[in-house]
Amino acid sequence: MSSFVNLESLISERGANCRGADEIVNNETTRILTSQIEHSQRSKKVNIRNKLSVAECDAFRARYGGAFDVNLTHEYTAPHSLAGALRVAEHYDCIDSFPPEDKIIDFGGSWLHHYSRGDSRVHSCCPILGPRDATRHEERMCRLRKMVQTSDRFVDVPDFCLNKAEDCNVQADWAICIHGGYDMGFQGLCKAMHAPLERGILQGTIMFDGAMLFDRQGELPLLQCRWQRVGTGSKEQIKFDFINESTLSYVHDWKNLGSFLTESTYSIGGTTYLLERMLLKCSIMTYKIIATNVRCPPESLRHCIWFENISQYLAVQIPIGYNLNDWKTVRVARATVREVEEISFRCFKENKDWTENMRSVASILSAKSSTVIINGQSIMSGERLDVLEYHLVAFSLTLNLYQKYEKLRNFQGELEWKGWANHFKTRLWWCGRTVSTEGGFLRNFLADKIPWLKLNTYADSLDFITKISEVESFEVDSVPTSRLRSFFQKEENIVERAASEIMSANARRIAKKAEMSKEFDDFVDAPEEFAPEDVVEEVINTPVTQDVKLRQSKPETARSIVLDPDAVLKNGAINEFADYSKRLHENTVSNLRHLWTLMGCRGNEIHNKSVAETYHRVDDMVNVHFPNGHWMYPLKYEYTVGYNDGGLGEKFENELYVVDKTCSCANAKAIADACKKVSAPTCSVVMVDGVAGCGKTTAIKETFRFEKDIIVTANRKSAEDVRKAIFGDASDSEVALKVVRTADSAIMHGLPECHRLLVDEAGLLHYGQLLAVADLCKCSEVLAFGDTEQISFKSRDATFRMKYCNIEYDKRDIVSKTFRCPQDVVSAVKILKRKCANRSSKYNGWVSSSKVEKSLSKSRIVSINQVSMEKHKFYLTMTEADKAALCSRAKDVGLDKTWVESNMETVHEAQGKAVDHVVLVRLKSTKCDLFKSEEYCLVALTRHKRTFEYLYNGDLGGDLISFYVT
């Protein structure tokens, strides 16, 4: 049945005045009127899809809530969300200030924004000033195509060009500039308005902070943006960095942005342009530039600029880096300076050394610019100074007091007649002033004719430079211009391309609608002789076409785009693990560099041993090796690398270097480099997911085939346990070391090819780590043994986000019978899983063959001295701090180092262990989330065969172990 209605036939048959036709006309008229009303109101409605905080929502509504119908949908998280939301509203605000039917030019704006709103009166000048602008055009093209394919509204070509604003020939009376003034400046905007066709009024917005005129850096708190001025003169720039954002920052010439703060008028020919700063809200300034050709008489303009209480501050000059040739301005509260001067002047003693007077000034300055605690309440006295500038401000204020004191004394002295010589000096040399930065006639004449004469004070020629430190900043602020050629060549190309994109997208949309319409048109009642089996048989017997065969064949080129989701997932996991390993190496280098600097290590000497002593008390693995071969502290650990000015790496006996716990096995960089060379394997992954004590190590031993298999473990201790289980006394043999390896060793040094890869405690491995090993050994199957509910892979960098750390398996075999755990542990774990709402856990149905009925107990202790050390027991802790305390306790009672290392571990380290007697020790009642962790508590409760004793000091909220152990 056709989907189209023949109106002419309907009218001829039924009549134009029939009720149905009348309703159709009325409905269509209503729809058109509704559409027109919605279009007229579109400029009054602002849809903001960014997620905003409560404070940001309030600020946005306070700024634009009255002028527009603000709709905050909170759909997605966007970088610098408030700034982006404000920018959308700024477009509406600026455009709404002009006549609704007049042409408007947008200097540097987004043509897609106006096109999506259907506002055809706005022409956008979008020059490509760098890679960012070029890539923005690419992104807009993608979004343009998406809009055209999903809506019938977009049929016209966007109205924009790639010309700079001053080169654009589009005629319009009005212009807008939304955050484009950073690259053009006030005078640049005036030139763009003037040539080639004059535009009457421009309205724009720009980020604004009055402190930019005085400070070198500052913050726009509501926008979460920091700004910093760098460089000097014509090369000075201002940088904007959004706090806690990963997006690109912004760098602009200071002279362009500064012009909006310092300039007010500019004339070109007979046209005068006036800058009017209209409104400052949310650290965004809305301004207007108005052009006039009217002959204007001279006038002194005074502009009220919002410097947010800037008049309450004084500029104090302080030296930079103890260099008397370089000074900077520091803002100090006017009240603080005046009170310091008032009190200090009363304490000023001429017979004192200047340092004594400076101490008095510093003491008073501290009292007037610090936090005072009275009756337990903090009261701010004055305004706090930067701790790095406090002493220099005190120094400058002291010199200022000396200067004022000397001025008064000289003034008093000049009141007395001291002869013609003194009269000559004060009148002709100093122009009647005893102290002046400007000389008199004679002094200026000599300085001009004989410039090499030293007519100023000794400070002008004093060269006193103290170089304290060098700080290098790695910055990438520019890209070679040649890179831009890969984006667009000519303006005609991009305009033609936009038209082509619209035609292509519209054609595809129309074709899709026609195809859907055809499907409905062809849908008719099937004849009686029609049978569904005929269609099935026809499809089955239809030969495969050549096109289909080509699509099924493998690509001939080596560089092919990976479209298989499984391959994409595996490549992502490997790359993530490589990046994670690289991050660990960078963290190690950064920490050691910081330690090296704090210790004051230079050359062959360490200048600040107290820092080393402090760090060593916290971590006894921190040590310093001297060039004479001795260590600062007795050597108790083995280190493979060290750090000094030569970087992190192997060191010689005659070098000075520092070490910490990461230097015992620093292999992260080697692992990262090796992972970059592997690719995603095609082998299958079978997960043997067994409960604690189900005999995973025994299963590995029975499954292992020497000729075909290789075993990989998560850590060195697991590898030693597996070697002992399989090879017995020959666990240190070359063969055992070759076929049973740790994952890190396999990645760094490689391993033989095999048919099957067996993995012990697979849950402790990163998925990318397991895949890298599988690719290196070219196996066809990975048999991973582990427990998906015990402790999994944990990142050692809290800031590194993991996406692929959990192992993805093709098949999972569940083992729910334990041979190790006593019966009361089985019951306790079942309750634990139910309390944690883990209804799908395999532990809900696990059973035990153990004959031990009662094993769990707990006791309260008040100190570590109540922990008895018994050689037949295994001691567990949740934290490294508790473990270190237990190790010290064991050494105090005379237990040897070998026993301590083999019988005291953290719960994380003990995963996979099986012992008869376990003692879990908690020495503090401070917050520890590990005792609330389901996986950590599961591991702790399932290590023993016979007894489990929980020794705890104080009550801890949410302690799952204490809850289930009675």
UniProtKB/Swiss-Prot annotation:
Residues 71-261 form the Alphavirus-like MT domain. Residues 687-951 are annotated as: ATP-dependent helicase. One of its GO terms (cellular component) is host cell endoplasmic reticulum membrane. SUPFAM superfamilies: P-loop containing nucleoside triphosphate hydrolases. Residues 49-381 are annotated as: Methyltransferase. GO terms for molecular function: ATP binding; helicase activity; hydrolase activity, acting on acid anhydrides; mRNA methyltransferase activity; RNA binding. One of its GO terms (biological process) is mRNA modification. Residues 660-815 form the (+)RNA virus helicase ATP-binding domain. The keyword Transport does not apply. Keywords: ATP-binding, Helicase, Host endoplasmic reticulum, Host membrane, Hydrolase, Membrane, Methyltransferase, Nucleotide-binding, Transferase. It comes from the Viruses. Residues 816-966 form the (+)RNA virus helicase C-terminal domain. Transmembrane segments: none annotated. PROSITE patterns: ALPHAVIRUS_MT, PSRV_HELICASE. It is found in: Host endoplasmic reticulum membrane. Its EC number is 3.6.4.-, 2.1.1.-. The keyword Phosphoprotein does not apply. It is a peripheral membrane protein. Belongs to the bromoviridae replication protein 1a family. This is Replication protein 1a. The lineage of its organism: Viruses, Riboviria, Orthornavirae, Kitrinoviricota, Alsuviricetes.
